[in-house]
Regions:
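Short Gly/Pro-enriched turn/cap motifs at secondary-structure boundaries
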Residues: 92-93
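A conserved acidic, glycine/proline-rich C-terminal tail/linker
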Residues: 77, 87-88
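N-terminal pre-ligand scaffold of iron-sulfur
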Residues: 1-67, 81-82, 96-117
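Short cysteine clusters
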Residues: 48, 73-76
Length: 117
């Protein structure tokens, strides 16, 4: 059976209230991030809209603020709503992170589903 996308990890590898970066195309740096909050998963391109291509994490898998309720860009401190990706504070106010399609299979495996070109 064909997998439903590119395997990222298993659901239990991202604890609730935590985040993790991924490099599904083996580019040498994380190109997407996944946040698990309240049982839901939110996936975004790992690039700040203020300066396109700037990675968000300040260290490996560190995408969230101290309160673990916002995604933070390490380059200039912009803060983003986890569920919507909307910038709520910082130089990109009103801009949004780019969403990424993911799927959780019945066995708990998380897959990235690239958009068709």
């Amino acid at each position: 059976m064909q997998p439903p996308g590119i395997r990222l990890c298993r659901l239990e590898e991202i604890p609730d209230g935590d985040s993790r970066g991924f490099d599904p195309l083996n580019t040498g740096q994380n190109t997407m991030l996944v946040v698990r909050q309240g049982g839901a998963l939110y996936a975004w391109r790992d690039a700040c809209p203020h300066i396109n291509g700037v990675p968000m994490a300040w260290r490996k898998d560190a995408y969230l603020n101290a309160g673990r309720d916002r995604i933070v860009c390490s380059a200039h401190g912009a803060q983003f709503d986890i569920a919507t990706g909307l910038c709520t504070l910082g130089p990109c106010l009103g801009q949004s992170l780019e969403p990424v399609n993911i799927l959780v299979a019945g066995d708990g495996t998380i897959y990235w589903q690239p958009r068709p070109r």
